[in-house]
């Protein structure tokens, strides 16, 4: 009798735990740094020829990944990196304005990163692409619950991070390369 009661209690706990998950559906978030950019104008440069080629390679590489939403920063280089994939998928990329950290302008303000993560989490079960910057992608991965938070070299443009979010604050990060080096 005790064994039967324990089994029933265990089953009830499993059911309660399942409902306590807030119907969270796993999602995959693809994150890339913008493609290679021109040196001028310094404020908001477009992509170099190599960057345009890389953005087209990204579109080819991710076209079958089931991406439903694309987020970029307000800068031309992120929008131009996302544009070929958005066009191929019939999507419009959503731009999120990133603000600099007041104590260190080379870093992104935490509230900007939180806004990106909140937008991602508003899309349960959807695969999302985020095109960002070397100083924003690691923070987004960390806030998604990534188990590995990379440092992105300023001279590298070929990293693709795939973050599988299993539950709030629990995620697995896979890093791979795409396009030519």
Task: Give a label for each model feature.
Residues 1-23:
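Bacterial Sec-dependent N-terminal signal peptides
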Residues 23-124, 137, 143, 148-181:
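Active-site-proximal alpha-helix that buttresses catalytic centers in soluble enzyme cores
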Residues 131-133:
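Short beta-strand segments
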């Amino acid at each position: 009798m005790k064994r039967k009661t324990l089994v029933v209690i265990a089953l009830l706990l499993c059911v309660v735990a399942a409902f306590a998950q807030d119907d969270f559906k796993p999602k995959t978030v693809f994150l890339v740094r913008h493609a290679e950019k021109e040196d001028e104008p310094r404020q908001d440069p477009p992509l170099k020829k190599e960057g345009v080629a890389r953005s087209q390679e990204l579109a080819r590489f991710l076209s079958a990944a089931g991406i439903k939403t694309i987020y970029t920063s307000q800068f031309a280089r992120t929008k131009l990196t996302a544009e070929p994939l958005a066009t191929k998928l019939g999507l419009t990329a959503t731009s999120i304005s990133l603000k600099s950290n007041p104590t260190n302008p080379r870093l992104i303000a935490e509230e900007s990163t939180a806004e990106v993560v909140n937008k991602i989490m508003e899309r349960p079960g959807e695969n999302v692409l985020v095109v960002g910057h070397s100083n924003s992608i690691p923070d987004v991965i960390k806030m998604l619950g990534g188990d590995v938070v990379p440092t992105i070299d300023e001279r590298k443009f070929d990293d693709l991070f795939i973050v599988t979010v299993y539950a709030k604050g629990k995620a697995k990060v896979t890093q791979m390369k795409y396009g030519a080096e």
